[in-house]
Amino acid sequence: MRSRSLLLILLNTVCSVAIVLVNKIVFQNAGVAVSSLLTASHLIFQFAILGMREATSPSKAFHRFLHPYSVLSSIAFSICMPIQNLSLHMNSIAANQMAKVMLLPCSFLLNYIFFRNAPSSRLVPSLLLTVIGSLMFQLSDSAATLASISISFIMVCSSWYCQTTIEQCKKELSMTATQQMINVLPLSTLFVTATAPFIDSVSLSLSAATSQYSPLLQLPSTWFAFLFLSCCLGLVVTWTCFEIVQSMSGLSYRMLSHAKTVVLFVIGINFNGQPVCLRQWVGAATTFTGVVWYLTLVEPDTVAQHADSQRSDDKAKLSENKRVKNE
């Protein structure tokens, strides 16, 4: 079992890094904005695989995709995924990874604004350190523009909204992560495919202000091969994520996610040969210091919550067993 978990972690890490690099190549050699087209291709590919799976072993969760909570989750997912690809299109890989790290402190801020859920005071210094480091890197990026920074900010907000909505839907409908994906995928595929031409036409005007990419791949067949490879990698990443979430603690999964961020950051710096100034290095170091600090602080709380939850479940099972015996 342990060897299977390690294999899943390795496969997820390799494919997660590979898909970012492949997507960047697809964007650089498309000649036009294709962020939403890429997202639609991923969803259509995964929906086709899901359709074949449902044909052989139907799932009850698949028939609940028109539930109001499922529709809301699908809309959130349809907004989040194209914007994530658009952010990768308009930013360097390293800058995009720094923007993703901002989701950690921004989640606490947005939860406080909309739900009045204030973070623990002892977590605030680590979150501020993460924000300062990420902003230092973003604002020191010579290739950054107002449009690219704005898209990064929108990506963070939409990712938070997507996570919040999907978590609420999963709680209300009492579904696993895999069942949630089955619910979200049909309508998300429809929404993204229908809106992809419009979104890409708008993003084309924005990306015109960003750096112009020189084509590396000349043959259209080669470009479509990379597009297909991206879809395959996306399917593997999605599947391994669900498997890992079910077999790892939340903290371990967050550590894995941030480890992938560091790997992509290092690779991304050398991807386009863009020079990185000292201030950016300091910003990156500050960001990851804040992340590690946060994870060390949140570890005791995570363990305690898990223990409390386990004790509550045990008490409920014990009470149920006593009731059955008395009857």
Say what each PLM segment does.
Residues 1-327:
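Polytopic endomembrane small-metabolite transporters, centered on the Drug/Metabolite Transporter
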